[in-house]
A protein has these predicted regions:
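N-terminal Rossmann-like NAD(P)+-binding domain of SDR-like oxidoreductases, especially those catalyzing
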Residues: 1-143
Length: 143
């Protein structure tokens, strides 16, 4: 399967890329390095023993998204490219709205125009607050 991973050089994104590559999937990945480093790309290749397609791209840039989808046959998107720092989100909410909402809409619009109908969206454990016990179960109430 050809899988696009957004936020690919972040902690969860990079580990997901390694797992997907080890399982034999073709990975197309992008990140804007807002909260990660470029050298993670080489670490993913070293750990998985495989190469993959990478774009230095921002999901809020419609042209970046169009380029990625035009140059690749994508079957599914795994979406990790969201800002997640709760304290910062309260201090600069418009930046979070722009990236997390507008950026996701840009991604979804390009997916629609290229007939890509499968997406896995990763949220954050911060939606649960401070649970009294771990692990958190599926029916745990949100904060």
């Amino acid at each position: 399967m050809n899988i696009l991973v957004s936020g690919a050089t972040g902690f969860i994104g990079s580990h997901t890329c390694v797992s997907l590559l080890e399982e034999g999937h073709n990975v197309i990945a992008f990140d804007n390095f807002f909260n990660s480093k470029e050298n993670v790309i080489e670490h993913i290749k070293e750990l998985s023993g495989r190469d993959f397609v990478f774009y230095n791209a921002d999901m809020t840039n419609q042209d970046d998204m169009e380029k990625i989808f035009s140059e690749n046959q994508i079957d599914c998107v795994i979406h990790f490219a969201g800002y997640k720092a709760v304290g910062e989100s309260v201090q600069i909410p418009l930046s979070y709205y722009h990236n997390n909402i507008y950026g996701t809409l840009c991604l979804l619009n390009v997916m629609k125009s290229h007939n890509v109908k499968k997406i896995i969206f990763s949220s954050s454990a911060t939606v649960y607050g401070n649970p009294a016990s771990l692990p958190i179960k599926e029916d745990f109430p949100l904060s």
